[in-house]
Structure formats: C-alpha cells, structure tokens
Design a protein with these regions (language model features):
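Beta-strand elements of well-folded, non-transmembrane domains
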Residues: 11, 56-58, 69, 109-113
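A short, structured loop/turn motif at beta-sheet edges
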Residues: 13-14, 41-45, 68-74, 92-104
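Hydrophobic ligand-binding cavity/cleft-lining segments
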Residues: 1-40, 45, 133-134, 140, ...
Length: 151
C-alpha cells in the first residue's frame, strides 16, 4: 500500500528542520515513544540505525529506523521495520511562498506476515490516519511548542 500525506507547518524551513532533525524532539510529537536507542552509524546520518520503543497502553512496540537518504533541508528518507511490517518513508520539505514549510510524506507499507497483510487490506485508512496524526502533532510542537512527552 502506498499513500502520500501533506501538511503546511507555519514555521520557516530552517526552524522546521532544526526541530525535525533532533532525535530528542521525537518524544514531543510521537505519542507513545518512551525510549530511543542508537544501534549503528552516525546518529541521523545516512545509514544510521536507531531502535524506537513505543508503549500504547499495555502494548509495547519496537521499531528499527534506518536513514536511507539525507538531503536536508529538502529530503529525509527512512525505513521503519517491526516484526510484522516494513515501511518505506520518503519525506520532502519545501519553503512555501509565504515563508512557511510544506511537508510531503510518501509511505509504502509492506506487510511481513499474513495477519498484517489482512489488516492492511481491511483497514488501509488506519495507516494514513496515523501518519497524519504524527504530522499534525509535529506541526503543533513546531508552531506552539506543545509536547506529547508526558501525554
């Protein structure tokens, strides 16, 4: 499944990238993120791997992030892998005519087991909705300084 989401964030591109490119900021806009662990490579750089640990109620989820392209301030691509799903994400950032930032995210989800294949088939909108939630939460963090770290 492939889809594209877009959002305008009302901060200059430089401010957007400074907030987006800091590992410690992820907890402010990725609800449920409880820990991150460097695995390999230079943090945030091409080829770097990081373990992201999320907790949703009593459910724990571990995702491995691998940076696949870094061309800031315009592009940041990464793969996100769990035991059941592989997500190829391509993020594009551009300065708008009014001096803000347009964030376009292209996602491709590849299920790694039958259960996820069925879930992706039956509820594809859940994945797009979650992507949009993260984008809106980043927008709120970047524009208003509102953190989800303790939410």
């Amino acid at each position: 499944m492939v889809y594209i989401t877009e959002i305008q964030v009302n901060v200059p591109l430089e401010t957007f990238i400074k907030k987006m490119d800091r590992v410690e900021n992820k907890r402010h806009w990725q609800k449920g993120l409880v820990a991150s662990e460097h695995i390999s490579g230079d943090i945030g750089q091409l080829g770097a791997k990081m373990k992201l640990i999320y907790k949703f109620g009593s459910r724990k989820m571990t995702i491995v992030e691998t940076i696949t392209k870094r061309n800031l301030p315009h592009e940041l691509h990464a793969n996100y892998t769990t035991k059941t799903m592989h997500n190829i994400q391509q993020n594009y950032f551009e300065r708008t005519t009014n001096g803000f930032t347009k964030w376009t995210s292209k996602n491709k989800f590849l299920p790694l087991n039958l259960v996820m294949r069925v879930m992706l088939y039956l509820s594809p909108s859940l994945f797009k909705k979650q992507s949009l939630t993260y984008m809106r939460d980043f927008k709120n963090f970047a524009e208003n300084g509102i953190s989800l770290a303790n939410a």
